[in-house]
């Protein structure tokens, strides 16, 4: 029975690690999609005076479809990983070996922390993408209003020129901000990759510790004995010090 329950726990851990690896790859691709959307919208904004609006709209709609598809896939993976974590929690509550509960709870908490990090990263990237898309839609509407005004009036007066120059300044400011965001996202991708390597090393160390519980028990007994010996030695030193003081004052 113990072998069967242990096999069930290992199967759950295997499922959790597989889903975590899939989520890690999906989130990196999702972040790259957000970055490419920002860059393409900037390029489209710079050349929209010399080309029609057909190509940017097609590019935007294609990226929007990719965004929706990837968001659904990531949400499904998060839901599956949540279900696996819930099953692991049920197993730890029903496990009949008290000595293993601490190790199981530690492993479960680690998987929960990973799930929380992935969920937070997904919602943050999704919010950034939505903000960029909303801003680009707003700027596109402004450009259309300007072009409509120019074609309707046919007058290229000083006021319109100043307005267009101000609009160009805003576009340049947006481009600088987007480049800064791109650098930050690239840094985040590198940190995510390093976190994956550290997670793999930590997982292997926990696996070794769980496979050899006798080693953990022996280490704990050694630490307890060292602590006891330290207390005894401290007591002996204290008694000797008191006796020396009494002898010195007499």
From Swiss-Prot:
GO molecular function term, any single one: SNAP receptor activity
Residues recorded as bearing Phosphoserine in the entry: 141
GO biological process, one term: vesicle fusion
Keywords annotated in UniProt: Acetylation, Coiled coil, ER-Golgi transport, Golgi apparatus, Membrane, Phosphoprotein, Protein transport, Transmembrane, Transmembrane helix, Transport
Start and end residues of each stretch annotated as Disordered: 38-59
Location relative to the cell: Golgi apparatus membrane
Induction remarks: Expression induced by hydrogen peroxide in neuronal cells. By monocrotaline in pulmonary epithelial cells (at protein level). Negatively regulated by OSBPL7 via GABARAPL2 leading to degradation on proteasomes (at protein level).
Residue intervals on the Cytoplasmic side: 2-229
Coiled coil: 9-30, 68-95
Modified-residue entries (N-acetylalanine), positions: 2
Transmembrane spans: 230-250
Tree of life domain: Eukaryota
Pfam families given in the database record: V-SNARE_C (PF12352)
Bilayer topology annotation: Single-pass type IV membrane protein
Family: Belongs to the GOSR1 family.
PANTHER family associated with the record: GOLGI SNAP RECEPTOR COMPLEX MEMBER 1, GOS-28 SNARE- RELATED
Reported function: Involved in transport from the ER to the Golgi apparatus as well as in intra-Golgi transport. It belongs to a super-family of proteins called t-SNAREs or soluble NSF (N-ethylmaleimide-sensitive factor) attachment protein receptor. May play a protective role against hydrogen peroxide induced cytotoxicity under glutathione depleted conditions in neuronal cells by regulating the intracellular ROS levels via inhibition of p38 MAPK (MAPK11, MAPK12, MAPK13 and MAPK14). Participates in docking and fusion stage of ER to cis-Golgi transport.
Subunit organization: Component of several multiprotein Golgi SNARE complexes. Identified in a SNARE complex with BET1, STX5 and YKT6, in a SNARE complex with BET1L, STX5 and YKT6, in a SNARE complex with STX5, GOSR2, SEC22B and BET1, and in complex with STX5 and COG3. Interacts with GABARAPL2.
Entry protein name: Golgi SNAP receptor complex member 1
Provenance organism: Homo sapiens
UniProt gene name: GOSR1
